[in-house]
C-alpha cells in the first residue's frame, strides 16, 4: 500500500554563494558521480546573489554541449534554504539530493544516497564522520542537533549536514508550505513516513571561507527555535511564575531579616537587591526577545511576500529567460 515508486531520475540541487574557486571542481565531481548512477539526472545550481563570477561560470556550464546543468540566478542573496527552495521549484527528478558547494561533503557520496532511497525511504539524511570544522562550529552543531531532537522527538544525528535525499512527494509538500523561516531537513522529516541516515565523509574546505558567520549561526538558532515549536513561550510563562514566586519569597525574607537584625543589616544587603533586580530585568528582556521573534515571524508570514525572486533560469542548450518572482 505504501510501496515507494521506483527512482527514474535524480536531481541534484546545489546553492552557490561566492564559490567561484570551487565551482569547476564541484561541477566535474558531481557530474562524474551522477553519470555513474545508471539513471537520468540533472544538476541545478542556484546562484544566491554572488558578488564574484560564480553566476558567469554557472551560465557557461549550462551552455556547454551535452550539459545536464540548469542554472537559476536569484537577483540578490536570500539565504541558503531559500535558494534551495528555489531549486526545488524547478526540479524534474523523482529523487532530489541537496549538496553544499564547498565540497566538504563529497559528491561521490551521491550514489550511496540514491541506493539507500531505493530501499523505500522518503528521506535519507547523512552524519558527517571525522568533521573538519572548528571547535566552535562543532559545538554549535551539537547544541542545534540536541535542540531539534528534543523538540521534534526525531533522533536524527546531524541536521546540519545538507547532503540529503528527498523523494519528490516530500519536495512537493514542502513547496506548498509558505512560512518564511524554513529549515528544510526538519520540514522534510515532518512529512516523511520513513527516514534514515547514513555516515558520510567530511573534508576540509579547500577554497574560501565558511559563509556562516557567528551572527548567522545565532540567527539560525532563532529560526530553529521559533519555526519548530511554541515550547519557548510555555517555558517563558513557567520561568515568569518561578521568578515571581522567588521574588515574593525573597521580599518576605528580607522584611523578616530587617525586623530581626535591624536596619544596619538591610543596608549591607543593597548589592544583593541590585543583583536580584538585574536578574529579573534580564529575564524580562529574554522573554520580550522571544516574543518579538515570534511576532516578527507572524508578521512576515501574514505579509506573504515571496521567499525569493528568480531573475533568470538557464537551461541546457537554451537561451536565458526572465521569470516572475516565485513563492
UniProtKB/Swiss-Prot annotation:
Enzyme class at the top of the EC tree: transferase
One MF annotation (Gene Ontology) recorded for this entry: undecaprenyl-phosphate 4-deoxy-4-formamido-L-arabinose transferase activity
Periplasmic side: 257-269
Reactions catalysed according to its record: UDP-4-deoxy-4-formamido-beta-L-arabinose + di-trans,octa-cis-undecaprenyl phosphate = 4-deoxy-4-formamido-alpha-L-arabinopyranosyl di-trans,octa-cis-undecaprenyl phosphate + UDP
Chief localisation class: membrane
UniProt entry keywords in alphabetical sequence: Antibiotic resistance, Cell inner membrane, Cell membrane, Glycosyltransferase, Lipid A biosynthesis, Lipid biosynthesis, Lipid metabolism, Lipopolysaccharide biosynthesis, Membrane, Transferase, Transmembrane, Transmembrane helix
Domain of life the protein comes from: Bacteria
GO biological process: 4-amino-4-deoxy-alpha-L-arabinopyranosyl undecaprenyl phosphate biosynthetic process; lipid A biosynthetic process; lipopolysaccharide biosynthetic process; response to antibiotic
Membrane-topology annotation of the record: Multi-pass membrane protein
Functional note: Catalyzes the transfer of 4-deoxy-4-formamido-L-arabinose from UDP to undecaprenyl phosphate. The modified arabinose is attached to lipid A and is required for resistance to polymyxin and cationic antimicrobial peptides.
Full protein name: Undecaprenyl-phosphate 4-deoxy-4-formamido-L-arabinose transferase
Gene: arnC
